[in-house]
Amino acid sequence: MAGQVVQYGRHRKRRNYARISEVLELPNLIEIQTKSYEWFLREGLIEMFRDISPIEDFTGNLSLEFVDYRLGEPKYDLEESKNRDATYAAPLRVKVRLIIKETGEVKEQEVFMGDFPLMTDTGTFVINGAERVIVSQLVRSPSVYFNEKIDKNGRENYDATIIPNRGAWLEYETDAKDVVYVRIDRTRKLPLTVLLRALGFSSDQEIVDLLGDNEYLRNTLEKDGTENTEQALLEIYERLRPGEPPTVENAKSLLYSRFFDPKRYDLASVGRYKTNKKLHLKHRLFNQKLAEPIVNTETGEIVVEEGTVLDRRKIDEIMDVLESNANSEVFELHGSVIDEPVEIQSIKVYVPNDDEGRTTTVIGNAFPDSEVKCITPADIIASMSYFFNLLSGIGYTDDIDHLGNRRLRSVGELLQNQFRIGLSRMERVVRERMSIQDTESITPQQLINIRPVIASIKEFFGSSQLSQFMDQANPLAELTHKRRLSALGPGGLTRERAQMEVRDVHYSHYGRMCPIETPEGPNIGLINSLSSYARVNEFGFIETPYRKVDLDTHAITDQIDYLTADEEDSYVVAQANSKLDENGRFMDDEVVCRFRGNNTVMAKEKMDYMDVSPKQVVSAATACIPFLENDDSNRALMGANMQRQAVPLMNPEAPFVGTGMEHVAARDSGAAITAKHRGRVEHVESNEILVRRLVEENGVEHEGELDRYPLAKFKRSNSGTCYNQRPIVAVGDVVEYNEILADGPSMELGEMALGRNVVVGFMTWDGYNYEDAVIMSERLVKDDVYTSIHIEEYESEARDTKLGPEEITRDIPNVSESALKNLDDRGIVYIGAEVKDGDILVGKVTPKGVTELTAEERLLHAIFGEKAREVRDTSLRVPHGAGGIVLDVKVFNREEGDDTLSPGVNQLVRVYIVQKRKIHVGDKMCGRHGNKGVISKIVPEEDMPYLPDGRPIDIMLNPLGVPSRMNIGQVLELHLGMAAKNLGIHVASPVFDGANDDDVWSTIEEAGMARDGKTVLYDGRTGEPFDNRISVGVMYMLKLAHMVDDKLHARSTGPYSLVTQQPLGGKAQFGGQRFGEMEVWALEAYGAAYTLQEILTYKSDDTVGRVKTYEAIVKGENISRPSVPESFRVLMKELQSLGLDVKVMDEQDNEIEMTDVDDDDVVERKVDLQQNDAPETQKEVTD
């Protein structure tokens, strides 16, 4: 027997065909959300307050500091927040200190700074009652970037950019005459040496001594018209502020504020890290020949002789000396923007491949401290040096799509940036108030205006492109949404501008971003998913784990290192399926491996690392596809995406053929209920589970507190599906930490169960499965195999209007008693009532305009004391196709103190209607391999083809759907599924390490089936066997959210567009079917003139004609001739608005006045039937 039995959770065993043992547990799949938010609460907020403190007034007398903060208890708990449409948030209170320097007085106060949304345990936020997810954003990391480009003459050129987190960009470029220019903040370019002079290197000689003599520098100095620091400063000022009178002082302060002021310019810690890494001498001296010795500055000894070529080993040896500033120089700069001395490291090397033995200087930035978030003069000089080195052939250009140059902004950082915006707006207000208020009586509370802070947080959660309504169709959709990475959003790319290169799969995505799971359509490649083992480091770079290889013994160790994409570039990584002996050494002398994106074969001694698992390449959703290795990538993409659209079924069933990921995905998705502590189950009910904690002290276990786990029962999910949790533990069970206690929707026994295992045959049947259509047995309808429950929410508000308040009541004008049968005395539908389309759910009347009463009404009013009420019926009715059973009714009243109602609303009623939807013709189904189709026919069970033992099969699929799509995985799943069913087992075939052909065939033989997996089928209608044997097996098929009930739509009359008077389009607007240009051509080709005329007039925008037609049909009269369509008038007005004189003439060249053809005077054509009924003799008569 191939494979070994593995336990998944408490209740499920699977036969696992994996050959590679798991060395690392999968991490918690939603920690990308939870960890980032924890960081924000722990450090991010404090960092913000520290950055802004102290706020001083213009005289420097008052100083406001933010000392500390705390979060209070939320006003409503999670459930209550959802019910009340409130935000799940806690009050943020900040301790503020105000210092008055004149008197030395210190005032401290705790100031309320608004309610701050809290993250739930499952990584979501509840905003206005709806669960939302903040998607992580992929952006370009702040750093120094060097690019290669070809100019119009075909010459190779370079440009460089220093990109900060916020602040001015600095760019270097060369022109056709080999002059190097600099651009400050996208303005006009200046010779590079002007910026150097402004930094304090005044004379030409100083600049040449600094950067080393080369042709580019000489050309630039010739072009440079300035001669000293002052002239250079004035020159820069004129470029940045044209038209203003330049002075040296103004120029200094301008340059200072652009680059050296921490409030205006911020590299952030990640920018400092990347800049130091890029400009560090270690990477730049690699494989270079020294033109001078490297000297330890502290001891004065020579570490490396002149003429040495530095390989990687040599550089590692001298690393300490390089970091202790070997060959460093300190420059005292006078008259510059910054008066502090500048320290750099410079080492001369020989220009590669140069016969004349020329040298160039490699300058490093002397490694500024990580606390220095601004750019330093040393950074600018070192980046210029790198640029000149590139021109000499030393150094590397950067690939912007490499994940070493792209980083993630997760929830915490996105929130922090938003909070910073709010605080900086508040800072302005505080400064203004400081100058107005009286210093004696002033308090921190009076200075601080929290509105801008609250507004910026609300704006972020409510309307940011990255704050999204959670996709809650099933647990996998939930999980994937929380792990999504988007390159769109503020500060990111736009769909239109994103090039092919950005969207493409890059070698650095390996183990970090899934190469398969991405949407089809305009967002392809811009929205990605995090790989299964990946995690995000403190700088926001994605890391993936590798097993370390011992450099001496060349054996795999237990040490696991997480590497970022640029760290990985230095190492050779072996694949996870490399053969190892029992000591962890590679068995083959030549090992398949990766190095910088090249898949090659190298000697086993060269290996540095090895992959942790074959599934580290793909995301959680893709890892749920068995036999992924046998599917074409395009179909695998569809399979991964369609699993997220599977509707939770009433009776879910885990797949016979899984991958082992189902349990992990279900546990981490947030849809299941997991134990927060180890304990013993004391009580189980359908709506709650009680667990007594088991605590171990001094080796003795004793009982602790009681944990209560409430279960959600038949709630509506964000996608309108049924969210229901069911206990899977029994009283007395001892449960471990993080064990599943209750299944959520689409789960069975602690595993994800998106569909059902059904018996499928690959065969045609009277052409009903043409074009991927699916033929299904009626058994699946009768036995509720694919029945799903859907819950829709409808609400009705009673508002205050100008004419008086609206009223929710049972007393509705012109409505029969039978229409009110489901309403209670308040006018609200009963729970449990069965309602059909058009039934009243909430009776509501709205006051109409008050009219003058007639004499009779006045008399009645005098006798009975009541006026006939002038109200119109505005009741909430069941929309088309939404009938069902009323599940729940919620009523909110302003009188009862419901402060969550929006202004002007007195009463709000919410009605939940539940539908049980059986599977229909027209519903969409799919497998896990991108094999999708629409149900074309539901065949009675007795007519379905049946197996030799008399069992009818469930589904017939078209065999032509397999070869051209190249998703052979579905065929292997089919065979292995049948074997698993016959053996009564569940199997796991992990991606890239699953069952191979031999395993599948041997399992089939073990199950007593034919070796080719085919069988004789008999036609259910005739009882005759089919000519050929047919592949029959068990496939896991899902019902997708594209259901025909939601798409079916019909209209007779309905709303019309205001300008063109044509019917609206789409089901949501109750629109019509568009009869477009091509359809008109089709009718013209047939010569169907009258059909065409009525489609273009009565049925569309002939406003008068359609009313007359409706009238004629109701009265049984003949339909009158059409008048002018409204869109023709619109066209005329359009042309007239362009200044053209447009008139409509009849055959006698008399102008037809279009304005006359109005609703009041309709042109009617009357036929004198006595004369002749030919159309030519019809006369035009205007009534």
Curated annotation (Swiss-Prot):
Listed Pfam families? RNA_pol_Rpb2_1, RNA_pol_Rpb2_2, RNA_pol_Rpb2_3, RNA_pol_Rpb2_45, RNA_pol_Rpb2_6, RNA_pol_Rpb2_7
Q: Which HAMAP family match?
A: RNApol_bact_RpoB (MF_01321)
UniProt keywords (A-Z) are:
DNA-directed RNA polymerase, Nucleotidyltransferase, Transcription, Transferase
Q: What is its EC number?
A: 2.7.7.6
Q: What does this protein do?
A: DNA-dependent RNA polymerase catalyzes the transcription of DNA into RNA using the four ribonucleoside triphosphates as substrates.
Q: Which species expresses this protein natively? A: Staphylococcus aureus (strain NCTC 8325 / PS 47)
Q: Which PROSITE patterns match?
A: RNA_POL_BETA
GO molecular function annotation: DNA binding; DNA-directed RNA polymerase activity; ribonucleoside binding
> Per its UniProt entry, what is the enzyme's top EC class, as one word?
transferase
Where in this chain does the entry annotate a coiled-coil region? none
Family per UniProt?
A: Belongs to the RNA polymerase beta chain family.
Q: Which domain of life is it from?
A: Bacteria
Does the keyword section mention Chloroplast?
no
* Protein name, UniProt field: DNA-directed RNA polymerase subunit beta
Got a GO cellular component term for this one?
A: DNA-directed RNA polymerase complex
Q: Which reaction does it catalyse?
A: RNA(n) + a ribonucleoside 5'-triphosphate = RNA(n+1) + diphosphate
Complex formation = The RNAP catalytic core consists of 2 alpha, 1 beta, 1 beta' and 1 omega subunit. When a sigma factor is associated with the core the holoenzyme is formed, which can initiate transcription.
Is Transport a UniProt keyword of this protein? no
Q: Which GO terms describe its biological process?
A: DNA-templated transcription
